[in-house]
Every structure is written in structure tokens, then in C-alpha cells.
A protein has these predicted regions:
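ATP-binding N-lobe of GHMP and related small-molecule kinases
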Residues: 1-58, 234-242
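FAD-binding core of FAD-dependent oxidoreductases
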Residues: 1-4, 54, 58-68, 99-113
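Short beta-strand scaffold segments in enzyme catalytic cores
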Residues: 2-3, 9-14, 105-109, 114-116, ...
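Alpha/beta catalytic cores of group-transfer enzymes, especially the acyltransferase/condensing modules
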Residues: 85-131
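C-terminal nucleotide
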Residues: 125-242
Length: 242
């Protein structure tokens, strides 16, 4: 489960022949394995990918997955591949998983809103529900966490905590419950960073609620809860359509 932000990633794909670096993010050359895998899967390895986003990389916002998804859609248009949405989402999902940079980001991003993953897999196998909301979102980023390092280690504790949280959220699918369970999941999976923990406590003391973005040194909240706790957060909304 998660939150699809209006602060997204814009991707442009140009067919081969450019002298520009093959992949750039906010004007800087960058290596994104998930993007390379999408290009190979769609037979567009000669393409130039240009991505822009206000979101930091490695801070729990699923930027690599969003870049992979945007690349899939942009390649489909630029190269006239004539693939269906499910095909494109599946290609980006596989690329993100195989790159070790995400497990469910792409499918959730394609769904939009506050998605709940009921069953794993691409759109032809997985099942997704959602929580109705049109809330303001605030976030504060303190640093980055390596998703690949976490997912490549022992994930037994993480998986068990996730299954408990998902079951509880399905019983009560609300935005408030999502925050509470996200916070509990981070603690049970031993993922909560000190700075996010401090931010969460400050928000609680101010009468609000907050949680940690997965996987990043980032605290997020709905409404004005981070602002009310004295932080100067970035502000966006929930994007209803991914």
C-alpha cells in the first residue's frame, strides 16, 4: 500500500542518434538499471531518455520505478510499439523488480491514488484496490536509503510485518489507518531511521500523524501535520490516476 504523489516524474524518449547521454535525470547523466531493462525489453536500446522530477532519488518515492514506467509509455509512443497498458506496466514492473529497486512500486504508480496491493505481480496476475481520498500530502527528506541493499538481504522479518499490516489495512482501508500501519511496519521491520522517528514523534506531540516513506529517510503526512509540528515540508497532493 502507498501514496501516489502529484509530484511525479516526467519522461521523454527520443529515438537513437542523439549525442546526449543515454539517460538523464534533471539534466544530469544517471545510470538507472530499471530504465535500461525497459529499453531492452521494448527493443529501444538506442533511445535517449530525459527525465525531470522534483523528487529526490533514493528517498522512498519510487523514482526508479516511475522512470521505468514513464520510459515504457514514452517508448511505446516514440517507436509506435502499439503495446497495451498492461503490457507496458508489466515491462516496467519486471524491470524494477529485476533491478532490485522496487517490488510493487510500478503497479501501484500505474493505479494511482492510495493503492492497496492485494496480490503480487504485474497487471495480468496481481490485484490492486485503493483507498478513496483527495488529501494534501507533506513530506520532509533527510537522506537516502538503498532499496537494493534492503531487498537483497534477509527479508523474512520485512515480509511478515508487511503481511500483518496489509491484512489490517484491508479490514479498515482509510488514510489514517494507512499512516498508523506504515509506522508500525517500519518499526517491526526495523527500517525506521532516527531522523524519521524524531519527526514522527514531533508530529504526534503536535496532535498529528506521520510515517516513513519506503524505502527512504523521509517522513510524510497528510493535511498540514508536518507543518503544524514546525517543519518546512514539500507539499503536493494525491494523484488520482498515477
Amino acid at each position: 500500500a502507498g501514496v501516489t504523489l502529484s509530484h511525479g516524474v516526467d519522461v521523454r524518449v527520443d529515438p537513437g542518434g542523439s549525442e546526449q547521454p543515454p539517460v538523464t535525470l534533471n539534466g544530469d547523466p544517471i545510470a538507472v538499471d530499471a530504465v535500461d531493462r525497459v529499453l531492452n525489453a521494448l527493443d529501444a536500446s538506442d533511445a535517449t531518455v530525459t527525465a525531470e522530477t522534483p523528487l529526490p532519488l533514493g528517498a522512498g518515492f519510487g523514482v526508479s520505478g516511475a522512470m521505468a514506467l514513464g520510459t515504457a509509455y514514452a517508448v511505446n509512443a516514440a517507436y509506435d510499439r502499439r503495446r497495451s497498458e498492461n503490457d507496458l506496466v508489466a515491462a516496467a514492473h519486471r524491470a524494477d523488480v529485476e533491478a532490485g529497486t522496487g517490488l510493487g512500486d510500478v503497479v501501484a504508480q500505474a493505479r494511482g491514488g492510495l493503492p492497496i496491493r492485494l496480490a503480487p505481480g504485474d497487471p495480468t496476475h496481481g490485484r490492486v484496490d485503493g483507498i478513496p481520498t483527495a488529501s494534501r500530502v507533506e513530506y520532509v527528506t533527510f537522506g537516502s536509503v538503498s532499496t537494493e541493499a534492503v531487498l537483497s538481504g534477509d527479508t523474512t522479518r520485512l515480509t511478515a510485518a508487511g503481511e500483518r499490516a496489509l491484512a489490517a489495512l484491508r479490514d479498515e482501508p482509510t488514510a489514517a489507518r494507512l499512516l498508523a500501519l506504515s509506522r508500525r511496519f517500519a518499526r517491526e521491520a526495523d527500517l525506521l531511521t532516527d531522523r524519521v522517528d524524531d519527526a514522527v514523534e514531533s508530529v504526534h506531540e503536535a496532535g498529528g500523524d506521520a510515517a516513513m516513506a519506503m524505502l527512504g529517510d523521509t517522513a510524510f503526512a497528510f493535511s498540514t501535520d508536518l507543518s503544524d509540528a514546525g517543519y518546512d515540508p514539500e507539499v503536493c497532493g494525491v494523484h488520482p490516476a498515477g
